[in-house]
Amino acid sequence: MKRAQIDAFCGCRETLYQRIVFFAAPAILLAGIVYVAVRYAQLPAEIPSHYNFYGEIDGYGSRGTLWITPVIGILCDALMLAVSFFPQTWNVGTSVTVFNRALVYRRVRDLIADIRLSTAVMFTAIAVWQTALTPTFPWGMGVLIGVCCTAPLVRFFVRLAMKK
């Protein structure tokens, strides 16, 4: 579907926030790829690849494994972008009526944008952290991952409850 068709189907126009995220999420992922590419030649052939519960390194792998995280991030973003073009496939969790159609679809479009942005931040942060060769697992990374996983849902449900 084209954007105009999606807007007509949803009964609402794409917001400025959604347009910004449309470009910001891939830009963030690209920044992570550039960082890995710039640092790649300076890295040893074998790098830490796994950490135990105490944050100590307990596994090593090839530096080529650094590309896995950005590629997964790109695939996740591409999948979410593809889903955003087919609103009729969204499971919105409520009955969509003539009266609530615009609100429900606007909120779900925002949720998809939030998930794209959070996913891009999370995968880029992981790629940068892996490339930095930190000797222990930074526990702040766990907090970042937790926030990236829960913030879009919290924002969605709070805004849905407010019904603005």
Feature map (PLM): residue ranges:
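Short, Lys/Arg-rich, polar N-terminal cytosolic tail immediately upstream
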Residues: 1-14
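Active-site and channel-lining beta-strand-loop segments
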Residues: 36-68
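Membrane-water interface of transmembrane alpha-helices
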Residues: 39, 75-95, 154-164
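Interfacial helix-start motif at the membrane-water boundary
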Residues: 56-76, 108-113
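Cytoplasmic juxtamembrane regions at transmembrane-helix boundaries
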Residues: 86-110
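Alpha-helical transmembrane segments of multi-pass integral membrane proteins
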Residues: 121-164
